[in-house]
């Protein structure tokens, strides 16, 4: 069904140098696709055979509901924004070009979207393809779902979602009115964390499907496998965006606290992985203390409060520990242990 406003669902696929995997991704998407769905592929200036693979796939699979856009390399955030600019569906979803969806992906999701009841439909992912949802008679993976209703400025139903902190963009289908004019932060990584939590605050009704409809392929190109210096800055940027939001929306403070704490812990972890210790810069130190000031500390563990209250001490202790461990390793190495 195609209505006057466009398709029911737009699927945006950003891609960059994924020639080896994109054919499998497209094949998984087209297992159960209907004419209610448009596919928007945005090639972020690939230098390998990605474009050739895409064209070869569609030369063998006739499909009138595909838009292919190729632009110079600008990063995944801008690439997704280009996809948003071309999307006409009432709902919008995202699939990464190296991942797979289960064969019942559209069979499950489209009936939910046709109801036009939900602001977000979310589901789970798996990193083990053997755990991907399969609709088999008598299978143990029966479809399980529940609604999250938000009313009268009561955001408590969002607490489990924010506590889990699973902001994977690919596991969410958004009503286009929820996204509105929001766009992905350009030239930032971890854009899912910067974007997704704020969409939930605009919702009235969310459908949570517990099953694993999406296979996330871990590969050497993923950001979790390739930490760069600016990654922690992006996480602290997300935290800053949230505490600034809370200062204007006090009624969302308790739920937002969970996201703020998640950002602090994730940013801290990235710094240690990249730098060897919690090497907060001055901007981060300022962000941490501003964030703590707007948190609902009743739901935060005391040891985390202390680390946020005294980030200079947290940094110094971790630096001393790092230097001692490094010296010991060097000593053992020289002595041939």
How would you name each of these model-derived features?
Residues 28, 43-54, 73:
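A conserved acidic beta->alpha catalytic loop
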Residues 21-23, 48-57, 100, 104:
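Acidic helix N-cap motif at the loop->helix transition within catalytic regions
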Residues 97-207, 217, 221-230:
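Donor-binding/catalytic cores of nucleotide-activated saccharide
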Residues 275-337:
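Membrane-interface aromatic/basic loop that binds lipid-linked glycans or pyrophosphate carriers
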Residues 71-87, 108:
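Glycine-rich, basic loop-to-helix element that forms the pyrophosphate-binding segment
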Residues 36-45, 67-72, 97:
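Short beta-strand/loop segment that forms part of the nucleotide-sugar
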Residues 27-36:
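Short, acidic, metal-binding catalytic loop of nucleotide-sugar glycosyltransferases
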Residues 92:
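Short aromatic/hydrophobic "clamp" motif used to bind/position activated sugar donors
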């Amino acid at each position: 069904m195609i209505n006057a406003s466009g398709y029911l669902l737009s699927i945006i696929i950003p891609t960059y140098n994924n020639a080896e995997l994109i054919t499998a991704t497209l094949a998984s998407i087209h297992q159960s696709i209907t004419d209610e769905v448009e596919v928007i592929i945005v090639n972020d200036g690939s230098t390998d055979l990605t474009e050739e693979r895409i064209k070869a796939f569609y030369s063998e699979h006739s499909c009138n509901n595909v838009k292919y856009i190729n632009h110079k390399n600008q990063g995944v955030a801008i690439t997704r924004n280009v996809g948003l600019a071309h999307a006409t569906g009432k709902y919008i979803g995202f699939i990464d070009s190296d991942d797979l969806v289960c064969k019942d992906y559209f069979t499950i999701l489209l009936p939910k979207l046709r109801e036009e009841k939900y602001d977000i439909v979310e589901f789970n992912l798996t990193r083990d393809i053997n755990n991907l949802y399969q609709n088999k008679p008598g299978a143990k993976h029966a479809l399980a779902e529940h609604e999250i209703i938000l009313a009268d400025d009561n955001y408590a139903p969002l607490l489990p979602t924010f506590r889990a902190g699973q902001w994977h963009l690919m596991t969410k289908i958004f009503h286009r009115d929820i996204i509105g004019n929001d766009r992905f932060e350009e030239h930032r990584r971890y854009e899912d964390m910067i974007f997704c939590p704020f969409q939930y605050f605009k919702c009235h009704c969310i459908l949570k499907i517990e099953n694993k409809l999406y296979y996330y392929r871990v590969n050497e190109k993923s950001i979790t496998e390739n930490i760069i210096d600016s990654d922690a800055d992006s996480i602290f940027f997300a935290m800053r965006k949230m505490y600034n939001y809370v200062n204007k929306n006090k009624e969302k403070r308790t739920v937002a606290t969970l996201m703020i704490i998640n950002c602090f812990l994730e940013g801290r972890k990235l710094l240690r992985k990249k730098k060897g210790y919690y090497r907060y810069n001055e901007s981060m130190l300022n962000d941490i203390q501003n964030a703590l000031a707007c948190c609902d500390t009743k739901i935060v563990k005391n040891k985390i409060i202390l680390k946020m209250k005294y980030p200079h001490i947290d940094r110094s202790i971790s630096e001393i520990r790092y230097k001692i461990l490094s010296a010991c390793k060097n000593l053992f190495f020289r002595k041939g242990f």
